[in-house]
Amino acid sequence: DNSCTPKPSCFF
């Protein structure tokens, strides 16, 4: 997903 832009939740 590209929704990790507003928050660093893409690392989890």
Swiss-Prot record:
Expression across tissues: Expressed by the venom duct.
Highest taxon of the lineage: Eukaryota
Disulfide cross-links: 4-10
Gene Ontology MF: a single term: toxin activity
Keyword Protein transport: no
Major place of residence: secreted
Entry keywords, A to Z: Disulfide bond, Neurotoxin, Secreted, Toxin
GO cellular component assignments: extracellular region
Domain free text: The cysteine framework is C-C.
The protein's name: Conotoxin Cltx-1
